């Protein structure tokens, strides 16, 4: 009899010991009984016969984790302080299909690859000679053509490639564009793909018919057996960060894989039998291990500082762009209405943006548009109506609601909410002849709806699109002459040290939707005109100025971690928080910079408390995460969300 520790998939349980009459391969999938229910699990390791009686493994499936998946599983569990079973749940959607040995040859001939400019070729060469690189390329500078060329070289080397994109950018048009160069060897992978279609994609992927996957962050967990390239497009995008446990960032996982792939474990017997490691001779580059390329027109401050980058300036668009500023309060001003009317008269189109996450909980001055900052943290404080106070969610400092602006002495206004539905009604009243549609997650619930709406817009059946951050993604609106951006002051005033970075990147992305084929106009409704005028044409200047402001307290110069405690009993949640805090105080080089009730103190019938930590290396945060894990708390390393 053999004995094994089994990782129970998608459960917070520690590995449990089971017996089996035959020898099993590590990380093969099995069915076991937990309580009186059947559960899936992975063989973790063989152990000696335990002193207690244990259940027998019910059966073994044909599924197993690949070397890349095992690397990811163990790293995610360790780095993000997650139970192995919870981390293993990330791979669970791919367990339904059998693992088919990858023995077929990929049929692409790459005869229609795009021709690169001299600068694009330099960027390609730079990227393929570094394990990890960043292409910092202006909108329209030709990043996509570089991606396609890098993918082609990887596939020619007999390897697999993964193109990660924000989910909303993964349109049928994107698939057709990739298939233009790589025939049918492309699989699109995101949450709106039907289960049956996913199973067909997996079958073709595992047989080798598909070697290129274009997908959202979950595609990183597919069973790659010979991955050679990961491209992370729009690497700054928050959608790469998982909001629930384990709180991983797919971009950071892609970077880690590239840096550690050459140190990977010995492949399993099944992987070796597939003979996937054959690499043709006469290649331009060393394709051992995994290479990761990040790309963005507005890269994150952290990536710019830490990753070798190639600056790809210029644009292939033969167009010009004019920026206009509207100082009116949030809403449709006469200026905006008149410009929209002119666009419609010229048979052109417009897009109007409203922020999704403008939580409208920040006090803004009506006269100068500035918000109220914490005197100890240099971040904006949030409005708490019930307490009639402003509060910092970093350190817990609070102050009574002011009666005047600390900057100019003017009156203080509470932000008022305007959503896409209200905005659409206002537009229909002001422009009754216009054909107006909403473009947000409430409206776009399926891939088919997205495809239909984009087609209708590009066919001229819609005059004005009113949307949220979905509008900012890389859709090609060829007849858009005007982009209107509302609500950025609320976005800029978020209680987040990244508020300026996120807001400017968003403004530049939305502005990029206008004037792609001709002259375009961008109207930004803001009281912070000076900020936008300083940086809209030079994001790199903003990054350099922002780095000076952040040193030494914020990333990339320091590391942050947020521990979230939630419990149905508020007293129990508060007590667990105090117990964790007491243990954290013994960790050297760890700073507790804030704790208390979370800004959203009650979600899903559970009370929420937080602890915010800072360190200048990962080790203290890892120790803190292990303490939190023992109490069942969630640790968010490198947090994006402070609610």
What are the functions of these language-model segments?
Residues 276, 284-286:
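Intrinsic-disorder-associated, low-complexity terminal segments enriched in Asp/Asn/His/Tyr and depleted
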Residues 373, 431-434, 584-591, 630:
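Short secondary-structure junctions
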């Amino acid at each position: 009899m053999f004995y094994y520790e089994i990782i129970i998939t998608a459960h917070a349980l520690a590995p449990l010991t089971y017996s089996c009459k035959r020898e099993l391969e590590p990380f093969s999938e099995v069915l076991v009984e937990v309580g009186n229910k059947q559960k899936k699990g992975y063989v973790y390791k063989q152990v000696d016969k335990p002193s207690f009686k244990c259940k027998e493994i019910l059966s073994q499936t044909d599924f197993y984790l690949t070397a890349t998946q095992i690397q990811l599983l163990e790293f995610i569990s360790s780095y993000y302080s997650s139970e192995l079973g919870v981390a293993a749940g990330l791979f669970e959607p791919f367990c339904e299909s059998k693992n088919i040995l990858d023995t077929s040859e990929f049929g692409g001939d790459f005869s229609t690859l795009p021709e690169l400019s001299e600068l694009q070729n330099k960027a390609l060469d730079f990227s393929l000679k570094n394990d990890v690189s960043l292409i910092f390329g202006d909108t329209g500078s030709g990043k996509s053509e570089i991606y396609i060329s890098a993918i082609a070289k990887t596939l020619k080397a007999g390897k697999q490639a993964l193109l990660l994109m924000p989910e909303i950018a993964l349109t049928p048009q994107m698939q057709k564009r990739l298939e233009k160069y790589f025939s049918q060897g492309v699989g699109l992978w995101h949450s709106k793909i039907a289960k049956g279609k996913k199973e067909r994609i997996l079958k073709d992927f595992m047989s080798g018919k598909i070697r290129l996957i274009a997908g959202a962050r979950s595609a990183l967990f597919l069973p790659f057996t010979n991955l050679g390239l990961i491209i992370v497009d729009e690497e700054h995008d928050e959608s790469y960060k998982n909001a629930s446990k384990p709180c991983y960032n797919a971009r950071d996982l892609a970077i880690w894989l590239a840096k550690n792939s050459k140190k990977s474990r010995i492949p399993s017997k099944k992987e070796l039998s597939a003979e996937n490691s054959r690499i043709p001779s006469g290649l331009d580059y060393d394709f051992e291990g995994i290479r990761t390329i990040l790309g963005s027109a507005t890269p994150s401050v952290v990536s710019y500082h830490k990753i070798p980058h190639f600056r790809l300036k210029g644009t292939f668009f033969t167009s010009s762009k004019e920026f206009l500023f509207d100082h009116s309060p949030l809403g449709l001003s006469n200026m905006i209405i008149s410009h929209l009317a002119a666009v419609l008269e010229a048979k052109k189109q417009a897009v109007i943006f409203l922020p999704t996450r403008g939580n409208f909980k920040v006090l803004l001055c009506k006269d100068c548009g500035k918000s109220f900052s914490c005197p100890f943290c240099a971040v904006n404080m949030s409005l708490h109506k019930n307490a009639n106070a402003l509060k910092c969610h970093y350190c817990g400092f609070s102050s009574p609601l002011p009666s005047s602006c600390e900057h100019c002495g003017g009156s203080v206004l509470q932000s008022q909410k305007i959503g896409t539905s209200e905005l659409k009604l206002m537009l229909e009243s002001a422009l009754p002849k216009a054909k107006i549609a909403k473009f947000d997650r409430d409206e776009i619930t399926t891939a088919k709806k997205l495809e239909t709406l984009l087609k209708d817009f590009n066919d001229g059946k819609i005059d004005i699109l009113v949307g949220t951050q979905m509008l900012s993604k890389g859709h090609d609106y060829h007849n858009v002459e005007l982009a209107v951006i509302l609500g950025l002051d609320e976005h800029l005033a978020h209680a987040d040290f990244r508020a300026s970075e996120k807001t400017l990147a968003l403004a530049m992305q939305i502005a990029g939707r206008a004037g792609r084929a001709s002259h375009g106009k961008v109207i930004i409704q803001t009281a912070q005109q000076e900020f936008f005028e300083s940086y809209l044409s030079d994001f790199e200047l903003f990054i350099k100025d922002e780095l000076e402001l952040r040193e030494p307290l914020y990333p990339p110069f320091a590391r942050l971690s947020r521990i979230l405690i939630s419990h149905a009993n508020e007293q129990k949640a508060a007590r667990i928080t105090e117990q964790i805090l007491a243990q954290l105080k013994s960790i050297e080089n760890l700073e507790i910079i804030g704790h208390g009730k979370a800004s959203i103190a009650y979600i899903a019938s559970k009370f929420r408390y937080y602890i915010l930590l800072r360190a200048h290396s990962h080790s203290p945060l890892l120790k803190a995460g292990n303490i939190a894990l023992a109490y069942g708390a969630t640790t968010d390393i490198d947090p994006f969300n402070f609610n």
